[in-house]
Amino acid sequence: MRPLLLLAPLGWLLLAEAKGDAKPEDNLLVLTVATKETEGFRRFKRSAQFFNYKIQALGLGEDWNVEKGTSAGGGQKVRLLKKALEKHADKEDLVILFTDSYDVLFASGPRELLKKFRQARSQVVFSAEELIYPDRRLETKYPVVSDGKRFLGSGGFIGYAPNLSKLVAEWEGQDSDSDQLFYTRIFLDPEKREQINITLDHRCRIFQNLDGALDEVVLKFEMGHVRARNLAYDTLPVLIHGNGPTKLQLNYLGNYIPRFWTFETGCTVCDEGLRSLKGIGDEALPTVLVGVFIEQPTPFVSLFFQRLLRLHYPQKHMRLFIHNHEQHHKAQVEEFLAEHGSEYQSVKLVGPEVRMANADARNMGADLCRQDRSCTYYFSVDADVALTEPSSLRLLIQQNKNVIAPLMTRHGRLWSNFWGALSADGYYARSEDYVDIVQGRRVGVWNVPYISNIYLIKGSALRGELQSPDLFHHSKLDPDMAFCANVRQQDVFMFLTNRHTLGHLLSLDSYRTTHLHNDLWEVFSNPEDWKEKYIHQNYTKALAGKLVETPCPDVYWFPIFTEVACDELVEEMEHFGQWSLGDNKDNRIQGGYENVPTIDIHMNQIGFEREWHKFLLEYIAPMTEKLYPGYYTRAQFDLAFVVRYKPDEQPSLMPHHDASTFTINIALNRVGVDYEGGGCRFLRYNCSIRAPRKGWTLMHPGRLTHYHEGLPTTRGTRYIAVSFVDP
């Protein structure tokens, strides 16, 4: 009898091979249920097309007859499958894969699928799960499994058409009944299980259900390929199912599988389905509603509006909605609208006097676009976003996603405007790829669970899946998290792109509103924005040696400050108002005696000493080392101050040596406009600089060689900023 026992399985294998002689695409049909084309369904189709699967979607256009979020349901899938199988019931060679679609993707092709199906040595193979559902009382009836997952999962199964017809033949339930329970009861009936020849994919060789198995599944990269690997069983599943609460993990895996992103190829799908704006005239561009949100005291608001104006997009196709919650920024907003509001198609301002809550304002902005069918896009931008790339809006539109955000990070930090994963309670969790995405080691368009600060939404999405007028409320969540939770709940994907550097996030942690011009104090927290606002645009040319003049021996003259920097420093000093008396007695300095007194205010009097030292280190020290080769400075100073010269107050300054190794002297206003006269004369060289340029600095040696005097100011008021460096 032993030879006969050996021949039986061999005969079955020969039969199975005979059934599989045709090409995989000829004897395999994939059936799925999709009542509407969601983004999840389109992802499923894309992964299927990648491997050339034949797909037939059942139920498109039907209502889904189960309330969303309820645990029961799925009977509608059985009804649709039963009807679809009627024309295939006698096709013995036809293998049918039935699977969910919204939360499923393929990781491999038909040939591997059929090979693993045959190796299972059953006519029907169901996916297996770690958790029993929906009736835990049935646990004891399940066959014991020594290695692998024990419980049936109805989200995916494969079998020969006649066997599947037998499987669903007894279905007479309602659409709202549980398909999982229906299939479970058949499987747990030993007679039916044997008759239909059903087994489970215990070791996840074909199907990987993620619920209860998140720790088992990792990405496996290998020479331009990427798969999901089950660590527990060392298998490479063909289908990945984000069942239950694991859809976000499927989104993460779907950023890579199947071969959408690898280390060798980078992103292979980022240029699919783009909306090209090339060759489209301004008059044909889509209308964009820009929502601007100033929800807390924020540095560089004036710079924010300048960047908005620099966008390469016609204002006549842009509408503005501005919510300013802060009285502190009221003047800046009103100044911008007074100068540029008429350039936009329309403007709506909700100011601090209205006292509108953050979430309500954001709902209002989105609804303005939703209610206007001519609004093609809604572009939401918070004031703490530094949008430095003028092509930002066009680049986001071209990516052609329902919801997309550009990557924004804080300077020198991993803090960004997206999360790669969520914790069990719905808050931040770091995904495996988060750091690589933030630091640009992985570049692409990523499906993520959370975005904030800046994003573009299609108007059609706001009038469709996101039509709820209350997107920014959800339980007790903050508006940003509420928005993302509501978007996820509607099965709309949120994408993040780091294909281009469009800007960065400001740091608000140390921003103070106690000064007249608070941005001056942001050199540490937001150095790039501080540089853009306050450092002369030609400073880099000077650093390259292309814009440095030598009006007198060893005296160098180059641009350093913008007009705004000069004006704000002067205004800050006048606002402080505690000018010295210009006599020798001076309690502000060590010893209390000033040999060469001026009417001035020291940087430390306005709490600006630390920031001034940072400025010297970052911008003056590099020039010093270039202009005085061999000399290296740490930019130490005892005295840094702004001097005021007036004809009736202190018009000039007596000849003197500075108590420094070198001195910088920055002109803060304009000769011939703000004052007449003034300048500096170096006596030893009989050399004078009589027309200082606003924003330019003189740099010269201090003690010993460069004996100099301040020439008389004959009209108006002259201001200079002086530092005695390395005393």
From Swiss-Prot:
**A GO CC term?**
rough endoplasmic reticulum membrane
Question: CDD domains of this UniProt entry?
Answer: GT_LH1
Alphabetical keyword list: Dioxygenase, Endoplasmic reticulum, Glycoprotein, Iron, Membrane, Metal-binding, Oxidoreductase, Signal, Vitamin C
Question: Is Glycoprotein set as a keyword in this record?
Answer: yes
Q: Which GO terms describe its molecular function?
A: iron ion binding; L-ascorbic acid binding; procollagen-lysine 5-dioxygenase activity
Q: Which residues form the active site?
A: R718
Q: Which residues of this chain are annotated as glycosylation sites?
A: N163, N197, N538, N686
Q: Which residues form the Fe2OG dioxygenase domain?
A: 636-727
Q: Which cofactor does it need?
A: Fe(2+); L-ascorbate
Substrates-to-products reaction catalysed: L-lysyl-[collagen] + 2-oxoglutarate + O2 = (5R)-5-hydroxy-L-lysyl-[collagen] + succinate + CO2
Cellular localisation:
Rough endoplasmic reticulum membrane
Membrane topology of this protein:
Peripheral membrane protein
SMART domains, per the entry: P4Hc
> What is the protein name given in its UniProt record?
Procollagen-lysine,2-oxoglutarate 5-dioxygenase 1
Give me the residues that bind Fe cation, please. Answer: H656, D658, H708
Q: Which SUPFAM superfamilies does the UniProt record give?
A: Nucleotide-diphospho-sugar transferases (SSF53448)
Q: What is the superkingdom listed in this entry's lineage? A: Eukaryota
